[in-house]
Design a protein with these regions (language model features):
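Bacterial N-terminal signal peptides that target proteins for export
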Residues: 4-26
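Secondary-structure end/capping motifs
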Residues: 261-344
Length: 375
């Protein structure tokens, strides 16, 4: 297995996966619900009046303020930047959704706990394995969209590491927990993970070239770009090069709350899908929306690289006949097996209650998001 040098991921190609039949009847029902929408200009042009019928609007308003907690501050990651852009563009408002965005600290399980408790309503998880792990910790969350179908977690080492087994007896830094795809990669490579000292290393990747640690987990859209900007040398190890499956950019919500407010969940995902399409063509504009929220200063150039890297990975791992965010439980099961293989799980739980594609499928016809007023 050859590692990737200096953060340049291989070209992604669409995965040859079985087609999940879309819920066309649900999508047609959505069209019917929106049939009375007014024929105004698109929300990107600044319209604020509701574009859905009164009954649906009232249903959405009854949910009150909807809190979205970001994964990590206002970073331009998939499943995060689109929400920021949807709010800035007025897309939520046109669907009668009152969305409040709160910055997260990078504590995935902490965010899951907030959603499970009903303190927050939506949050991104790093991958589908984290949805499983959260529920194993009694944080009741459900994955409603998975945007990336390749591991985004990566392992960076100093260049003198020729084999992953060289890390035995060394120190590995992570942000809050060892990502499941990275742990699975280490196990697949024959590493005795128990011999590696694991520490929380924070979010400054310069600890790696300063030799404070010998390996660092991260996101291929983030830390490699940061180290490249510092002109530092490193070796990047990608889980898929070791046969490890994975995902990223998973939108999560509270399952009980979602059943109480199905139109809210549908229209939240509708606005996010609309924003993704817009931001794919207008990355600088959308990153600018995130910059406006960050009072501590914002590296616009770096965050544009984060967004471009992740949206390309989404496109490369989504088959042409699937919607962005599709859920394939066969792939989910393969990812969950990595948790079992690494000892994180004794057995793989029933995954169907943990992932629900109905809300995403209800707002799409074929691969296109249904938006009121569009021809």
């Amino acid at each position: 297995m050859n590692p990737t040098e200096n953060g340049k991921p291989p070209t992604m190609t669409p995965l040859n996966r079985p087609i999940r039949p879309g819920l066309l009847s649900a999508a047609l029902l959505t069209v019917a619900l929106l049939a009375s929408a007014c024929g105004q200009e698109t929300p990107e042009q600044g319209a604020s009046a509701a574009v859905i019928d009164n009954d649906r609007c009232m249903d959405n308003q009854r949910a009150g303020t909807i809190t979205f907690v970001t994964g990590y501050h206002y970073q331009a990651s998939v499943s995060q930047l689109e929400v920021i852009a949807a709010e800035a563009m007025g897309l939520f408002e046109t669907l009668c959704l009152d969305v409040e965005i709160q910055p997260g600290s990078g504590d995935v399980m902490g965010n899951a706990q907030l959603v499970s408790a009903g303190t927050a309503h939506f949050t991104p998880a790093g991958n589908e394995a984290e949805i499983v792990q959260a529920n194993e910790r009694d944080h009741e969350v459900v994955g409603i969209a998975t945007y990336g179908h390749v591991p985004i977690s990566t392992l960076l080492t100093q260049q003198n590491v020729e084999h992953l087994t060289d890390l035995e007896g060394q120190t590995l830094g992570h942000q809050s927990m060892l990502p499941a795809p990275v742990e699975a990669m280490l196990v697949e490579a024959g590493v005795d993970v128990d011999t590696i000292e694991q520490v929380e290393a924070g979010y400054d990747p310069s600890v790696l070239p300063r030799d404070q640690i010998q390996a660092l987990t991260g996101f291929r859209s983030n830390e490699p770009h940061q180290l490249d900007a510092m002109d530092e040398k490193y070796t990047e190890w990608l889980p898929e090069d070791f046969g490890v499956v994975g995902s990223f950019g998973v939108m999560a919500t509270n399952p009980e709350w979602a059943e109480e407010h199905p139109t809210v969940v549908e229209d939240f995902l509708r606005a996010v899908a609309r924003a993704f399409d817009h931001c794919s063509e207008n990355g600088e504009e959308c990153v600018g929306y995130a910059a406006e929220l960050d009072e501590a200063g914002y590296d616009t150039e770096h965050n544009l690289k984060v967004w471009d890297t992740e949206r390309e990975l989404v496109g490369g791992s989504t088959p042409d006949d699937q919607v962005n965010g599709y859920i394939d439980l066969t792939m989910t099961a393969e990812e969950a097996e990595t948790l079992k293989d690494s000892g994180e799980l004794d057995s793989v739980p029933d995954l169907e209650p943990l992932f629900d594609p109905r809300f995403l499928e209800a707002v799409h016809v074929a691969t296109e998001v249904v938006w009121p007023g569009d021809e």
